[in-house]
Amino acid sequence: MFVSVIDFLKGSFFKEKLNNYLCVSMMSLLRVTKRNGELEPVQFEKVTNRIKFLCLGELRDGTKVGDPLDGVCYVTVAQKVIAQITDKITTSALDEDAARFCASKAKDHYHYGVLGGRIIASNHQKGTISNFSKTMQLLYENRKPDGSFYPLIDRRFHKFIARNARRLDDMIDHTRDFRLDYFGIMTLLGGPGKPGYILRRHDGALNVAETPQHLYMRVAVCLHINDFRPLNQVLDSIKETYDMLSLGYYSHATPTMYNAGTHCQQLSSCFLLGIKDTMDATDDINETDTDTEEDGSIPACWTACARISKRAGGIGIGLQPIRSRGTLIAGTGGNSNGIVPLIRVLNMIACYVNQGGRRPGAFALYEEPWCADIFAFLDLKKNTGLEEERARDLFYALWIPDLFMKRLITAIELGDDKRSVMWSLMCPHKCPGLYQTYGVQFEQLYESYEREGRFIHQIPIWDLWEAILVSQKETGGPYMLYKDHVNRKNAQANLGVIRNSNLCAEIVEYSDDQEYAVCNLASVALTSCVDTDTQTQTQTFNYRRLYDICKVAYRRLDAVIDINYYPVRKCKRSNLRHRPVGLGVQGWADVLLMLDLPFEDTVNEERKSTVINPHARELNRKIAEVMYYACVEASTELAAAREQGMSKLRELWIDNKIVFTDDGIDIVSMNGLSEEMQRLVEELRPIEGELNRDSHLGSYSSFIGSPAYQGKLQYHLWGVEPENWDLGDGTILNWKELEQKVSRHGLRGSLFRANMPTASTSQILGNVEANEPYKYAIYTRRVTAGEFVVVNKHLHKELSELGLWIPEIQKQIIKDRGSVQNIKELPLRIRDKYRTAFEVSKKTIQILAAEQGPHIDQSNSQNYFIAQPTNKILTNVHIGAWKLGLKTGMYYLRRESNQQPVQFTVDGGLVVNDKIKAADTGCVSCSA
């Protein structure tokens, strides 16, 4: 039939063609702003090809940056970017939009997150200087807004780089930036309101920033700044460290990554403080000692907290010496206000001295359950109640003696009569010595005070226990640490009774009001030790690689001790004397999935009964053994290497030709020394305590008298004798031989292993935090660009290969809050492997922790994920942890909200809004 021209012009077909023509015409008029500020017309093909090449793992010049990414449609990404182009938009903003869109698609395929990371890496490299030494030079020449010189990096560090610029520049492999996915590289780069790890200089028109590879090289160089070996050996060692960091084999803790090589190298994560129950610097009220640096008073503790928090340190404080409310103060005739007002001052310090303006200060306060103010202590973080009785910005922990747990179990066994078992609340001023003893000695002292009636109150122990559980259900805390377990297995037992842990409950070191313990942290990415057979595509765990990584990581952690800036003299004194470090793990759950292993196997699906997978259990134990063995061996090797030089220095020290202190050498006494002796002093950096003995001159100063000196390593303190075994390449873990080395040479440090939280560094490397299971199969990740939904990459890959990654199953996972347990279409083996942290038995988690324990000489920061905790569930969990001998019973209680999480739509698909109730958002200070 004939169609008139008028009808044709009115038709939808014509309108669609006209709209398309107009859109194309308008788009052709759009311009983009290049990085040099010039404008050029939009070239759609250029936009598409850029994303295409990165998807294929190449740069435009043909440089290979990774494998091709399957499951990713680069055309879709390009179309989305083109649709959002506005006139004069910058090419950098286009890249950011493309990467952000990729991140939003990570729920469809994890490779979108990889593509997003490649886009950001390419964008960042285009806006920075590729040359490492030139970047460091510009950071050194930084100026304040008023024009005054303010270098961002250390002068000595800068001079070393300038002298070795070519060698260091040649070591860097910029393609490794492209290994980081979107969430990892965005965590490194940071953004508005969230500082990243890289150093930046904003100086007028000059905008200088590190690349991730510059960051890793900066850390590597910093850790060798005191290395006095021949230059070629030092540079080889720098490259080894750089390679391990940039390839994701291990990571140093956040403070080390932030501050290495800067003008203030505060590289330590954890500070453990003691306190004395006095407001004065001396017990004599007639004295006027004003040295607040050295006294152990309450104001001295406040000052130390402010100084440490200013430099981004996480703090743990033992409050046990502080007298309870109502106790007489002899010096004034008044009565004590107890611990609450003191804690509120600490709360104000944490808020005011907010880690250099980057984030709130972070303090954890430790108290024992016999404290007369314990109920007020348990209420401090609650949302309700009088403001003058709350301090919600701090974290709280219990330091629990065995006697408390024994009486609690007795009460539970009595059933309805459980309130007949009593517990006495005491004041440390009226009942001295309780916090300074443990085990039988504590029990005898405590019960003698009960018989003498010296307690403040007596209460049913169940009432206190219920108050603890109520606080945990409401706030996620207090942490639970077991005082007697810590001290029976204390590798620093010759120093005294340990009274508290750190901010994240994994560091157990001696501290008091005169010595503040310090710990430097790093974590091994266990995923880097999984090898894939290229022919069979099967995976195996490479124990030899783990061994090598740990030896390197330990040596670098030991180097941190001498490089570090100490905010308080007591911290330096302690760290130089005892030299503890903490090497942990990340990616344990990823390793299990890569090796096709579940945490647990189902033995009866109807009854939902499970047992720990035996292969996972063996892997767990062997990893702990390798890590501890490697660290101890590296430590005794460092001690042996120092012996000859220390012997020469000791002769000079005995003849009074050189003077040392607990802080190092008296510089004046360097005058007149030969060049050889001066070099030895600079290389060995001894303190007086290391010279004041006849043997083990290469070991740390308090080694004599320690359990290790007596032939007892950590596994001996647990009553365990490990067996020798082959790492797979002929390297034998020979424990008796190791003990003989320790006996002969001593140890360079007192402590080696701690499993800390690794929130930030795990996100950078794309691993699950620490040794925790996955929280959900579908979950959210937060970076400066926003909050994005992602899928467990192992689950996505496995279900895709089976043809089961289909919309129906995805929706069921979302409906079940990120769980796959109710999806019967999935094989039982898969449902076992992908149990979430809420679904893995807490008993399994505890047994795995206990079987690592003989080879973790500090502790294990253990969260519990319990969807709806009850008093019965929590009681069983806590008693189970105590019976297994765990030092840290619980870090945080993580629970789901009582309300159904909101399920909202992103790009047409439902996702689960990850709402876990807990008291914190992750510890940055301890993240390693």
Mark where each language-model region is.
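Extended catalytic cores of very large enzyme megasubunits
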Residues: 5, 9, 22-928
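Polybasic, lysine-rich low-complexity intrinsically disordered segments
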Residues: 17-19
